[in-house]
Amino acid sequence: MSGLRKATGGYDEVPSDWMSATGTRALVLQDPCLLWLEHHGHKFGFKEDPEEYSFLSFIGAAGQKFEEHWLKNFAPNAVYGLEKDWDVRKVEGLQRTVALMQAGHPVISKAALWWAPEKIYGTADLICKQSWLAETFPGSCPQPDGRDGYVVVDAKFTRNLASSKAADLRMYSHQLRLYSYMLGNIQGQMPESAYLVTRDRIADPIRVGVEMELGQPLDPELARLRDLHLHIKLHGADYRPWQDEIVAPGLGNKKDEPWHLAKKKIVKALRGTPLEMLPHIGAVQKKGLQAFGFEHLEDLLCPEAAEFPFHALAGIGEQTERRIQAVLAANRTGEVIGAEDAILPPRCDVELFVDFEFFSDINVDFENDWPKLNGCPIIFMIGAGWLEKGTWKFRQFVAAEEYPDAERKMFENFLSFLHKMGIFDNARSAALYHWSPAEKWQADAAESRHGLKRLSDLPWVDLRKVFADTPIGIRGAWGYGLKEIVMAVGEYAPQFHSPWPEDLSSGLSAMVMGWEAYKQPRPLDSPEMSTLSKYLEADVKGLMTVLRWLQDQCPGPYHNQQASGRGGWYAMARAG
């Protein structure tokens, strides 16, 4: 293939001023701080997150298994361009890949690709003959029109890319287009398409248009991202994420492992509080505010900004504007905003505070669950707290195993406990307080799995909805996360202080910790379960503290759904 010499540029190893095809990730996620941390963080004392309970490591291992099983089922005779991904930096990996292409192998896994003129390189999961793809997936991939060249196929252990994960799809599409550009120039034929295999599109790959021509420069958007990446990589030591916008942390991006903790430190060191700390303010709304001269939250705290029309920003409606204004007013004046307007049940005869720990469906048994890959989405831990004669009580319920039958047994025990506590006694008023809709829809899902009808008849009250819909603002809280509300309440009224553990960096780490617990001979006695229990109790005790503070602020009467007209979030609490 004539493109090999041009692809290498005469180098034996990838030079330091090239970009990997995965290098656009942080920029697409609008979080250039991650790129700065990767290349310069250690010089400034920043360290990666601990490996233990890393969700990134977990999902990376799952992705590798997904690719292996896809090959086993669809292309068992695939050959490998590289033994290890990192060998892509050596010219021998590229030479082997090109030799396999010249031999006409229909499927090549771990294909090394370089293109020196554009300073890019990378390892494609697969490159496949277009005819092989068309024969294997006749409904998704067309037969070649002329020469039978190679096209890029990447395997991603994710789902719903085409419907609800626009940023992820854009990120993966950039990778595939970069791979395709290199492949096209090496083989002398630019592919029209590349393909994404995902867990819900195993035999129906997602098509990605390449939209570049042979011998032409890289697409302008990809070139822009490449140039920015290389500038940060090569010259980023001159920048500081806490003061330079070009490498600033993106608060809207939660996929920040392995730099989650380092990024938190940087956010605390920022010269001004980021605008994205406000509810529903993302990158688009931030640009809109900056156009009006607001660079930081402090700019919005001046009295002159009190009447700013947030509804003029893209995606901000009337209710969202009211939330933002309540948060700003509280932090501007130091006063609690809106609490006197909150609609709550009166103190009930039975009040319980509940939180669930949940497993998503990504812990998959690839051997036994192929191709459905449904995993085991269950609630594995329930925390319930209450006050008994003024003394805090806490009880937890844990599934003995990571199986649906164990979840059912746990819920049967939980429902028996609720019965003893009087939750189902129609002669008594009762409420189960929680934070966010998760507990309600997870309980409904468990009811569907197990036929436990009582789960659909629980008197839930979503305290987060009380705060967000009233809306309530309190100094120190810029949003409506449980932890920040609990912390703000404790600062405002120290008698309502509730401590918070710092063992877990995120809910995703909690899931990985739970999965690790179930690998142990006695999972319920494992250190992981002990840590999760402490975290769970902090959640439910925080709920109790917030409710008591709110009742102290607003001892108003119970209103039913019809009387209030606010959608009925409180109507599930049962009046005696």
What are these regions (language model features)?
Residues 1-143:
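Metal-dependent nuclease catalytic cores that hydrolyze phosphodiester bonds in DNA/RNA
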Residues 15, 44, 160-162, 203-204, ...:
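Flexible loop/turn segments at secondary-structure boundaries
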Residues 41-97, 302-342, 346, 523, ...:
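A non-catalytic, helix-rich entry segment at domain boundaries
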Residues 102, 115, 139-143, 338-424, ...:
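Conserved RNase H-like, two-metal-ion catalytic cores of nucleic-acid enzymes
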Residues 106-109, 117, 121-132, 146-147, ...:
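Conserved DEDDh/DEDDy metal-dependent 3′-5′ exonuclease domain
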Residues 194-198, 207-277, 283-286, 490-567:
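Acidic, Mg2+-coordinating catalytic module of metal-dependent nucleases/exonucleases
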Residues 271-325:
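Helix-hairpin-helix
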Residues 344, 353-389, 530-576:
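RNase H-like, metal-dependent nuclease domains and their acidic two-metal-ion catalytic environment used
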